[in-house]
């Protein structure tokens, strides 16, 4: 129906131009809030009434008369009604809605996607410190980041996925010292092990695993490097390098199991080694954007919207963490990414203003509001009716690997994407493995498998060819259930566009659940494999199109579309 809507919108623009030159391009179609009011609606008359000094309802009547004589409206529109102060509601003919089936079947996996724009976008997500296993919060971030990448790819963007490793901070030193203690035979609870509220140590069993492999002089491979342990318990730098490589490898395995890949791994340490951090500080100093106070170097970030000036270099000569962040984002800009999105936890909210202030102060041509941020809350895990807080492997939290092993990759992805990122979420493990309609991922996947079963039965019994359904006569698709399904299929491309613009993959989950429910209602109302060949082929074409859209939407989420369940 997208082609039909384009025709109708062009006719609307032409009619508005006739009534008020220059007004046409501003008009859009909306979906009526009440389905009974029609299939499309526009408020163009009410928007134009004031500048034209006309009664909005009378203007709507004039516009209605103009539309009724235009060819696209004569061909595709059944009725145009005026409601309230000047709402224009449009009811489409069944033939208009039926066009969606042809569009879906002809475009296949490309249905809903836009042609390439040439625009480049970088999405940075997960970016976990290599100090422990990925936790459930990282899982939510991985699902969000990957789905947002997929959404923007449907909109024609060239999307680049990047993982930023904070491998130059204090936590890496704690990782090294904890591994060294384990290698020396100590464990949490021993007098030699750091204890207390602010103890600098990692207590999870994974530290013992790292130490054992280090003593065994093993070689570990991470995404872009390999490191062989020396086994020397006194060589703290060797222990640090091995532990980081070990955990990067473990994180790589978790991400692979979650079907998330990255185009690049960017190391924080490279910003120091390349001189990019020093270059940023010099640029800001030379531009007069810094000052000395109490032995520290400060950025005049309040000049750029921050609530207070920020320390860049502490009295001991070390940089605060936001300085390499500014250098990193300048690197993103210099690599040609006009749009950058950072997926981070809500605990990073305070960094947004200072990073953007630093980028503006650097004066390298970066626009205000760069980069975009999507902030998410943490995830609470419930199993057997009780909250799960601790993993033996991690020592203090539930890992992403735990969740995948308890349920499945598909369930974890769908569940973690089913709410707005900034909404608190409880992951119910028992629900995620349930094979019933209460489980949303099962419900959607079952709808797809159910259609595949119908198509398979048709192929087996009659030698049917799904490819031939694109030429089916669709005129039998007249029932309320069929028309509702057709209209919902037609909304898929617009839903994708809106979800991408709002960084809202949860909208895709809502749509898929609604589509699955609509299909199940249709299936219950009309038998597909009837004796009448004309009716049968029309209904098969409709359900084949539905399966394709379910498949496409699940792919955006990184969830499989099984043919059997």
Curated annotation (Swiss-Prot):
It catalyses: tRNA(Arg) + L-arginine + ATP = L-arginyl-tRNA(Arg) + AMP + diphosphate. Its EC number is 6.1.1.19. CDD domains: Anticodon_Ia_Arg (cd07956), ArgRS_core (cd00671). The keyword ATP-binding applies. Belongs to the class-I aminoacyl-tRNA synthetase family. PANTHER family: ARGININE--TRNA LIGASE, CYTOPLASMIC, ARGINYL-TRNA SYNTHETASE. This is Arginine--tRNA ligase.
């Amino acid at each position: 129906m997208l082609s039909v809507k384009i025709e109708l919108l062009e006719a609307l623009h032409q009619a508005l131009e006739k009534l008020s030159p220059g007004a046409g391009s501003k008009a859009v179609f909306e979906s009526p809030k009440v389905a009974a009011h029609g299939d499309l609606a526009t408020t163009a008359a009410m928007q134009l009434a004031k500048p034209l000094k006309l009664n909005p309802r009378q203007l709507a009547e004039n516009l209605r008369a103009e539309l009724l004589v235009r060819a696209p409206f004569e061909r595709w529109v059944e009725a145009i009604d005026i409601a309230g102060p000047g709402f224009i509601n449009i009811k489409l003919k069944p033939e208009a809605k039926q066009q969606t089936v042809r569009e879906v079947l002809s475009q296949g996996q490309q249905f809903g996607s836009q042609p390439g724009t040439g625009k480049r976008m970088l999405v940075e997500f997960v970016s976990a410190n290599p100090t422990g296993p990925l936790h459930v919060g990282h899982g939510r971030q991985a699902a969000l980041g990957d789905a947002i990448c997929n959404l923007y790819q449907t909109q024609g963007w060239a999307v680049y996925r990047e993982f930023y490793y904070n491998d130059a901070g204090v936590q890496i030193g704690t990782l090294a010292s904890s591994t060294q203690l384990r290698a020396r035979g100590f464990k949490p609870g021993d007098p030699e092990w750091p204890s207390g509220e602010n103890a600098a140590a990692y207590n999870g069993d994974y530290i013992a695993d790292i130490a054992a492999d280090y003593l065994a002089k093993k070689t570990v491979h991470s995404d872009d490097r390999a490191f062989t342990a020396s086994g020397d318990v006194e060589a703290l730098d060797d222990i640090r390098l091995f532990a980081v490589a070990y955990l990067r490898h473990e994180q790589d395995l978790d991400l692979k199991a979650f079907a998330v890949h990255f185009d690049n791994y960017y190391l924080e340490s490279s910003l120091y080694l390349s001189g990019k951090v020093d270059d940023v500080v010099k640029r800001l100093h030379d531009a007069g954007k810094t000052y000395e106070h109490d032995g520290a170097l400060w950025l005049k970030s309040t000049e750029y919207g921050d609530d207070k000036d920020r320390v860049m270099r502490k009295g001991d000569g070390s940089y605060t963490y936001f300085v390499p962040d500014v250098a990193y984002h300048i690197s993103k800009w210099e690599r040609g990414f006009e749009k950058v999105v950072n997926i981070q936890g809500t605990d990073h909210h305070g960094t947004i203003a200072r990073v953007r202030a630093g980028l503006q102060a650097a004066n390298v041509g970066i626009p205000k509001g760069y980069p975009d941020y999507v902030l998410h809350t943490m995830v609470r895990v419930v199993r057997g009716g009780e909250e799960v807080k601790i993993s033996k492997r991690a020592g203090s939290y539930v890992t992403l690997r735990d969740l995948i092993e308890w349920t499945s990759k598909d369930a974890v992805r769908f569940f973690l994407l089913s709410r707005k990122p900034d909404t608190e979420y409880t992951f119910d493990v028992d629900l995620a493995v349930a094979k019933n309609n209460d489980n949303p991922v099962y419900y959607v996947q079952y709808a797809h498998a159910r259609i595949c079963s119908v198509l398979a039965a048709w192929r087996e019994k009659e030698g049917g060819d799904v490819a031939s359904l694109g030429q089916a006569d669709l005129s039998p698709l007249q029932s309320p259930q069929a028309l509702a399904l057709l209209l919902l299929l037609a909304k898929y491309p617009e839903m994708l566009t809106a979800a991408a613009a709002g960084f809202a993959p949860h909208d895709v989950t809502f749509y898929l659940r609604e589509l699955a429910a609509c299909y199940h209602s249709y299936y219950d109302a009309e038998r597909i494999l009837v004796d009448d060949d004309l009716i049968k082929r029309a209904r098969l074409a409709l359900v084949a199109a539905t399966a394709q859209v379910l498949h496409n939407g699940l792919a955006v989420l990184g969830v499989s579309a099984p043919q059997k369940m």
